[in-house]
């Protein structure tokens, strides 16, 4: 969970073994990561291991955002969780490690892959959660 400055410092001393991944909180409501960290990670080929990829606290899930999520859910015939996970992996060098507390949830999480949100759907979600 490094900031860009911390990651740069670590990279300066880790010349023999480059940093290849970093686990960070990353979900639909991660504008700081989108603006600051993601571009740096992509430029330096560092994989983001998205922790908390299903976490969207209710205070951030406004009626407008919920409506947009429901629209994308209907368009894709997927659940909100699947849409949220797929949105994360629509970014270059991002993988997810979603929490699961049941077999049903694990199966749902697994089916978040093998398909893609359209570029228009990704943009719609980006704009809604910016």
What are these regions (language model features)?
Residues 1-130:
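Beta/alpha (TIM)-barrel catalytic core signal, keyed to glycine-rich beta->alpha loops juxtaposed to Asp/Glu
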């Amino acid at each position: 969970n490094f900031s860009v400055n911390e990651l740069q410092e670590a990279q300066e001393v880790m010349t023999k073994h480059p940093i290849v991944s970093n686990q960070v909180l990353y979900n639909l409501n991660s504008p700081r990561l989108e603006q600051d960290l993601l571009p740096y990670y992509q430029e330096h080929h560092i994989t983001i291991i998205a922790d908390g990829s299903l976490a969207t606290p209710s205070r951030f899930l406004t009626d407008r955002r919920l409506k947009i999520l429901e629209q994308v859910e209907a368009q894709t015939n997927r659940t909100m969780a699947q849409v949220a996970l797929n949105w994360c992996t629509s970014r270059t060098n991002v993988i997810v490690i979603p929490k699961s507390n049941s077999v049903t949830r694990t199966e749902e999480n697994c089916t978040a892959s093998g398909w893609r949100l359209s570029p228009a759907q990704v943009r719609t979600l980006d704009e809604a959660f910016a």
